Each structure stands twice: as C-alpha cells, then as structure tokens.
Amino acid sequence: MAEEPIRLTQYSHGAGUGCKISPKVLGTILHSELEKFYDPNLLVGNETADDAAVYDLGNGTAIISTTDFFMPIVDDPFDFGRIAATNAISDIFAMGGKPIMGIAILGFPTNVLPAEVAQKIVDGGRFACHQAGIALAGGHSIDSPEPIFGLAVTGVIDTEKVKRNASAKSGCKLYMTKPLGIGILTTAEKKGKLKPEHQGLATAAMCQMNSIGSQFSQVDGVTAMTDVTGFGLLGHLIEICEGSNLSAVVFSDKIKTLDGVKDYIAQGCVPGGTGRNFDSYGHKVGVLTEEQKAILCDPQTSGGLLVAIEPNCVQTVIDIAKDAGIDLYEVGKLKPKSESDIVVEVK
C-alpha cells in the first residue's frame, strides 16, 4: 500500500499570513514606555507599520531590511517554501526596491516529520529566491512544535525612490495587482470543499512575484505602496490612510476575486483571521455586508500590491503593469481625512 502523502497543514494551528497576531494585540505588544532611539539615517522604522525598514547609506542608496515567516498554508512542502519566500521578498518590492539577498528562517518538528520534508521546504524557498534573482545565502533553524518557514531579506533602492505607506496624497486612485480571496480558497481546501477546477488557483496567485513594485517606484506619481497580506485589503489600506492622514473610499463592485470565492463564502469557508481583522479595525470602516466583510478583511498570503497613484500617472502605471502581464485594477480612491472616526467608506 502506498504511503499517505504528508499534509503539512495538519501540523499547524494557523495558516500563512492568517497566523499574524491581530492589529489590536500587536499594538499592545509594540507599545513601549522606553525612550525611542533616534537615528537620522533610519528613513523608515516601525512608526507607520510599513513593510520594511529603510536605512540611508548617505551615498544616494538606501538599504531595505525585512523579515516574514509563517506556518503552512498549503500541504506540499516545496510550494510552502516557495510561497513563504515569495511573501517575504514582496516586502522589498512593496518599498519599491530590489532584493539582493535572502536568509532562511526554519522551525521544524524533527521528531514528527522526516528531514526530507524540511529539505523540500527550503528548496521551495531557494527556488523563489532564484526567481527574484537573489541567493539564499544562509539561515537559522530550530526544533519547533510546528513547521515554520520564511526569510529575512535585504534589498537596495535609490533613496529618493522609496515608496512609504505613509506618503500617499489626497486624490490618488487606488489600484491592486492581484485578486482577493486567497484566505477563502485555502480555507475551502482545508475543509475539503474546494472544487477540482479551483485547485491550484490560490497557490498560483501566492507564487506570483510582486517584482513589478521595483518598476512602479520609478514613477513619481506613485505616492505610496504596500502589499496586502494578513490584515486584508481594509487593514492595509487603513495603515496607508492613518500614516498619510487621509481617508479612503473602496469601490466594492470593482474588487476582483479568485474564481469561486463568493460560493465558498456562502458555504462558510471564511478563515478565522477575517473575524480577528474586523474586530481590530471594523470600527474604522463604514457599513459592510457579510460578503464584503469576508472579502475585504480576508487575510491574504503573498497578496498583491496596493498602489496609490496620482490621476495623471494612472495610464503610465497601467501600461507598465500590462507590459509585465499584470492586470492592474482600480479598487478605490484617497480623500482628505474625514472628521468622523470612519477611515474607509465602502460603496
């Protein structure tokens, strides 16, 4: 009798970026009474919940540094490693930079799973690094109760081209590079409800590199950029709004989703992270239907880029995306800060 294939998702209590600590709890963790250390060369720190730290080298070039890791969101070890690495590298692209090196982070239950599984995970990470044009240059591993994988990634960028999530401008249009619904489809798969025709859709989306961010950064009219991951579209949009002292409108009828998403929502395939996200920032969002909440708060793993673009530069950015085979689509717009507590209105 053939051995049953190992299903990595059975060995973890969370999945992908849905493992993230909720924004509300994270705020408590990061709060400190200690005096802040000031470094004038640190261009981007943790004050605005940006995707990575940026350090000015003083010669027109800045270093970008980031880390990201999580537990399995798919069963295949190679795919898990590839997705985790792609997701980590994305933070460099979200700042507009170019990655130059990756360092692996591996936690593995050595008494539960064979070492060959870990080897495949690391190989998946190495494959993604090669796709991004960088070496997997080293790493660190520990024996842990659940499989964990990710990267610490270093990148570079021209200092003047850094795209912060706190530099958006009122009037900018908001665009996305990937459809939403990754958390919903992976939950449907975990529940055994995913239809054959939808197999692999989420994996393909998660493995798509956000390398287009390096090209977007060359357009001055791109005022802010972030990747949409565990806090969902609304969570990461709120970070842009609060960092930039703005409000936003989301056009729900323009949101693109992966095939089958709305059917799976109706079947109850909504990840736990969706509710945690809404509990954290729902009071900052206008009235939502249950379907809108499930889509807009859906935790994305290795999700697309959310880009704020000045209206006169929209066509330029669309053309750049089209040349790269990316279907950029509009999701909303930024406006002056509202006097109410509502940061994002959904229409």
From Swiss-Prot:
Keywords: ATP-binding, Kinase, Magnesium, Metal-binding, Nucleotide-binding, Selenium, Selenocysteine, Transferase. The keyword Disulfide bond does not apply. Binds 1 Mg(2+) ion per monomer. It catalyses: hydrogenselenide + ATP + H2O = selenophosphate + AMP + phosphate + 2 H(+). SUPFAM superfamilies: PurM C-terminal domain-like (SSF56042), PurM N-terminal domain-like (SSF55326). The keyword Magnesium applies. Gene3D superfamilies: PurM-like C-terminal domain, PurM-like, N-terminal domain. Belongs to the selenophosphate synthase 1 family. Class I subfamily. GO terms for cellular component: cytoplasm. This is Selenide, water dikinase. The gene is selD.
